[in-house]
Every structure is written in C-alpha cells, then in structure tokens.
C-alpha cells in the first residue's frame, strides 16, 4: 500500500506541475472501490497530498464511497475530521440469498450501523447504491429491500441496472449463474415497482437511476433544470474539468478524456519514475460534442427540445439523425418514447 501511495503522491505532484498556476478544486471524490481499505495514517496522507498541491474551495465538497462491511466507526470519525461530508454506501441488495449469490454478504444491521454513525457524526448527504436485476431477485424480494432502506431514509439512492458481462469482470461475477438472473420482463417489472415505491415514499426521481429527498440539492437542480451528468454520475456542477489520479483513473477536460493504466504494477513503476502515460484517450469532435449533449440532456431531464438543438447546433434534426429517427419511430410504437417534431420525451419504461 505504501508503495502505491508513493506513486500516487508522484502523480498528484506531476499533475499540479503540469497545470501550472496552483489550481482551486471544487470537489474531491474518493472512489474506485473502497478507500476505507486504507488505515488512518494512510488516509491522512492522501488528503495531505491534495492540500499540498491544490487549494480546495472553502465550500468545496469532499465525498467518498464506502463499504458498510469493512468501514468502522473510527474511520467515519476520521474522514469527517478530514473534511468529508458526503458518503455513499454500496449495499446492492439486503436479501441474504441474493447476497450469497453475488458473494457479498452484508447484514441489515451493518448497513444500519454505518448509516446511523455517519448521520450522527454530521455527514450532510448520505447515499445508498442498490442494484436491480441480480440473480434470484424478484419484485417481492426487492420490495423488501426497499422497505428496509426506506426505514434508514438515506438522502439519496442510486439504483443501477445489473449488467451481466461474465467475460469482463472479476471471478465472483463470472461465477454468477445465468439461469438465476431475472427475465427481462421481471427486471422491467422490478424497475417500475421501484419507481412507484420510491415516489410513494417521498423520493424524487433524478434522471434515469437516482432518487433524492425533495430538499436535496440534486432534487432542487432537477426541478430547476440545472442538473448535469458526467461519467461519475449526476451533479450540480457544470463545465468543471475532472482530474482522475490513481490506477485506472479517468480524466475529463471537456472535449477530451483519458485513462490511466489498469495494471497496478505498471502504474506504480511509471508514476514513481515520473513517466506515467495515459493508456486510453479520446478527443471529441463537433459531432461527438453534439451527441454527448443530447445524451446528457435526455439522461438529466428525460426529454429534449428538437428546436433548441436545431438552433444551437445549426442542424435539421431529422436529416442529421435520419437513421436514429427511424429507430425513435419504432421506439414510439413500443411505448418507449413520445415523439413529435418539436420534442423527444422518454416514458418510464423507455
């Protein structure tokens, strides 16, 4: 771990030097797994790395991902002391049989303990991540999970669709039995039941897969149409460069993306020798920027104004997206979108 932190220190210092004038940071996010794997002195060290190279805004946001199975009360206390105020707990599902099927055993009591500890310490926003479409999951079983989560009353919920890609992921995902997965019809039913349940529970649907209490800033941003989405998820921040550091980290500079190597030994060797080179990258052209804008608008607001895009990008929408328009007409017949010459609007099923 110390060798990895040495490499991380070198990368952060190198990025700061490359950017020139000492930059201000609006948000710091510890993610990519379980940062609480680090001990207290290691966590302090990472935070000190950031402060030594950048100025975090006075109202800057510190957020992290944590695993209730391994996160201790002492860690939560330390992280709060270091400035973290937003925390996201990966729960996935609370049904013991489903947890066993995905090799992630976690009791309801563990989730309760970590959430209540964070709340009592003063964390201002607590999120839970759930996943629908997991093996052995049904509408009834997932509703029970939602009922338990509702009792905990997190500020936000992220409810993601499970993607079964056995060739791309770790051993425990390859071990999942395909026959145990819910059918596409059952998966859609779980999704629609989730929307209904959370609406009745007082949560506002944010974009495609997030929910928040009405007073949460994401809910307010959605209401005011100032919500945005980047590769990290939904945010109230806009036009902010994202600098990713660490193994496999992704950076976004508006019209370009790049990613560090996913090989940890390679990362440590290159970063320590100050020879770290991105392994993937993409520069967006005008067409890419147009399509990204369309996708983000749909994901944030569930609809797009065709006339607005025609004016801003100087295009004839149906001509420019002639192939996609044929698909949209098909989706309209299937009840996935509402379609007119002025607007494209997603339905709940869509």
Predicted regions: what is each one?
Residues 1-18, 24-318:
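C-terminal scaffold of the Radical SAM
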Residues 316-332:
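Short amphipathic alpha-helical interaction segments
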Residues 330-342:
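A short, conserved structural fragment
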Residues 340-350:
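Accessory beta->alpha helical hairpin/"wing" motif in late/C-terminal subdomains of nucleic-acid enzymes
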């Amino acid at each position: 771990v110390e060798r990895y932190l040495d490499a991380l220190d070198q990368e952060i210092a190198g990025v700061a030097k490359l950017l020139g004038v000492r930059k201000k940071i609006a948000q710091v996010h510890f993610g990519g797994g379980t940062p609480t794997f680090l001990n207290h002195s290691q966590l302090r060290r990472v935070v000190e790395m950031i402060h030594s190279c950048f100025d975090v805004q006075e109202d800057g946001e510190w957020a992290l991902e944590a695993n209730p199975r391994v996160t201790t009360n002492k860690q939560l206390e330390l992280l709060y002391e270091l400035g973290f105020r937003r925390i996201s707990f990966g729960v996935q599902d609370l049904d013991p049989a489903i947890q066993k099927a995905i090799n992630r055993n976690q009791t309801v009591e563990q989730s309760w303990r970590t959430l209540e500890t964070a709340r009592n310490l003063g964390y201002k926003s607590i999120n839970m991540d759930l996943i629908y479409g997991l093996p052995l999951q049904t509408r009834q079983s997932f509703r029970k999970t939602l009922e338990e989560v509702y009792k905990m009353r997190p500020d936000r919920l992220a409810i993601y669709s499970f993607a079964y890609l056995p060739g791309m992921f770790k051993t425990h995902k390859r071990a999942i039995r395909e026959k145990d997965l819910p059918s596409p019809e059952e998966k859609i039913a779980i999704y629609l039941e989730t929307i209904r349940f959370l609406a009745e529970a007082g949560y506002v649907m944010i974009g495609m897969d997030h929910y928040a209490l009405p007073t949460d800033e994401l809910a307010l941003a959605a209401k005011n149409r100032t919500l945005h989405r980047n590769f990290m998820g939904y945010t109230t921040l806009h036009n902010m460069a994202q600098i990713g550091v660490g193994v496999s980290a992704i950076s976004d500079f508006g019209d370009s993306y790049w990613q560090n190597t996913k090989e940890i030994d390679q990362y440590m060797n290159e970063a320590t020798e100050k020879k770290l080179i991105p392994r993937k990258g993409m520069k967006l052209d005008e067409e890419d920027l147009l399509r990204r804008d369309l996708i983000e608008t749909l994901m944030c607001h569930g609809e797009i104004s065709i006339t607005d895009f025609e004016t801003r990008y100087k295009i004839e929408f149906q001509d420019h997206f002639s192939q996609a328009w044929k698909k949209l007409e098909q989706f309209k017949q299937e009840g996935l979108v509402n379609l007119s010459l002025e607007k494209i609007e997603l339905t709940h099923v869509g």
